[in-house]
């Protein structure tokens, strides 16, 4: 891993103002090293997704600062955020959001056509663990786990520096979920991609470099694993 943090998060707050004021983040301080595999744990509403959305440029902080390498992205405008997302960040969510009328290969090609130095779509699908004979299948012809692997391939095809994953195994059974985690681990290992995974499954923390525990909008504690478990050894 690089010595320099890829993210530096300083006293970040997030307040949603409506009929009820919600303090989603209450002064988060955190440094994330390039090439780390992080798992974020905590109950619903503890701030995990809010922080990841801010890191990914999908939301903005109410206060504090977020640095990506040496750039303060805290108050980027929409055009700057769009460029930042396009050039540096890949996203994997619980729901796959594939285009139903396109094959697996074509879904990935949608990204590679606008990226600067993309992977070949077939290579991205192979790395994500989708069998070659399934590349020309449509989403409706694929299992949930296969669709998630297409979504992962789509996210990594542009070679992002950061891969942000919000409950990527949340809708999957244990066997399929482990295969998805193996794909994320391979991307982290082979490309040095910084990977953040939000999950409610405490056991997944064993495969991380560090586990960040959230509670009430704050980082409650941080665990460091001296050795990382293989996804296949995780008790679901």
PLM feature spans:
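Conserved beta-strand-loop-alpha-helix hinge in the C-terminal portion
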Residues: 218-236
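ABC family nucleotide-binding domain
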Residues: 5-208, 213-214
């Amino acid at each position: 891993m690089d010595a320099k943090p890829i993210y530096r998060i300083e006293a970040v707050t997030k307040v949603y103002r409506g009929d009820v004021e919600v303090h989603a983040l209450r002064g988060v301080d955190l440094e994330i090293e390039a090439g780390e595999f992080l798992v974020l744990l905590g109950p619903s509403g503890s701030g995990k997704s809010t922080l990841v959305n801010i890191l990914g440029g999908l939301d903005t902080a109410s206060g504090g600062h977020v640095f990506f390498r040496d750039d303060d992205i805290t108050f980027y405008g929409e055009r700057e955020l769009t460029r930042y997302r396009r050039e540096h960040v890949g996203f994997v969510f619980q729901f796959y959001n594939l285009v139903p009328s396109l094959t697996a290969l074509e879904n990935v090609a949608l990204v590679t056509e606008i990226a600067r130095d993309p992977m070949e779509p077939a290579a991205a699908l192979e790395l994500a663990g989708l069998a070659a004979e399934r590349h020309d299948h449509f989403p409706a012809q694929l299992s949930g786990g296969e669709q998630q692997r297409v979504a992962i391939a789509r996210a990594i095809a542009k070679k992002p520096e950061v891969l942000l994953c919000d409950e990527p195994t949340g809708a999957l059974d244990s066997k399929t979920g482990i295969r998805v985690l193996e794909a994320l681990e391979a991307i982290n290992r082979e490309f040095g991609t910084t990977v953040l995974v939000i999950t409610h499954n405490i056991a997944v923390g064993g495969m991380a470099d560090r586990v960040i525990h959230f509670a009430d909008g704050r980082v409650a504690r941080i665990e460091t694993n001296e050795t990382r478990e293989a996804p296949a050894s995780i008790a679901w």
